[in-house]
Amino acid sequence: MCATLCTLLDEISILILMLLLIQLEIRVSAAQGGGSHAAMSPEQYWRSILPDSTPMPISISQLLGDGYPYSPAVGLPKRGDRVQIRYGPNIYGLAASQQFFKDPTMGLFFLETNLQSSKSIKLHFANMMAGTKFLPRGEADAVPFSSKDLQEILARFGVRPGSVDASVVKNTLLECELPANKGEKKACATSLESMVDFVASSLGTRDIKAASTFLVGKDGDTPAQEYTVTGARRMAETGQLIACHPESYPYAVFMCHLTEATRAYKASLVGKDGAAVEAVAVCHTDTAEWNPKHAAFQVLGVKPGTVPVCHFVQPDVVVWTRRG
């Protein structure tokens, strides 16, 4: 028994040493090939590219800091009571039977008129950040990020092949490799710096703003309850916006996509229990190509292409627009 225990301890020690060496290798590669911004922290890069009037949303700032120790337990995404729609070539093509929602009374989708003051919507806002941190760009760029390198990626981050977490990692890589939907641009940002670059390039300006839903003066979740809209304002006059959604991965990765024919709002909400939420809402103004059996149409009782379909975004999503 002692011999077996000693052998197990030796194997664990070797694994820990291998992981430490991998981290050292990544850091050395980053230091040697980081480019002109190699000495900048992600926060400094943000400030160097974006104007001072672009504050960093808490959904991003809480993911800063050293990306190590990373999380080998990437976990399955927990999406609360909202429709589970993954990005893909047919993102709006799922029928209601293919979508997941626990409570049919939840305001997953609503009409744009519901953003008028005094309107009430049943909602559940959950803090669903996975807890994994951003890697600095140099380190992220030194790590393979491709489905063809899956086995190497699993080994680097201590994810057991064949496990549920390995399947999650694989799905994230495959989703990131899917082509953009018609009329959209997309990219998976493996660092904050690459997210900023994609957004500025896609919107054609650095004069942009970023927003996320946040619970005022409160951490964690709020119960599912009725919220009253106390005010709403357009984030921008343009119909373009970029939404960045977190992906399940050993370190922070965001799927960002630019969409046309949309309107973004910032809405002030107050729950029945007094909870205050500053929420971001996105309204899709062209739904003509959506699946007629999509949950939005069944919930709202409307047909594709007739009225804008709106939804609030959860606190882990970042929405970017041009300023003004």
UniProtKB/Swiss-Prot annotation:
Cited PROSITE patterns: BURP (PS51277)
Known tissue expression: Expressed in panicles.
InterPro entries in the record: BURP (IPR044816), BURP_dom (IPR004873)
Domain of life (superkingdom): Eukaryota
Keyword entries, A-Z: Signal
Domain BURP per the UniProt entry, residue ranges: 109-323
Signal peptide residue numbers: 1-30
Entry annotated with the keyword Signal: yes
PANTHER family associated with the record: BURP DOMAIN PROTEIN RD22 (PTHR31236:SF2), BURP DOMAIN PROTEIN USPL1-LIKE (PTHR31236)
Protein name: BURP domain-containing protein 5
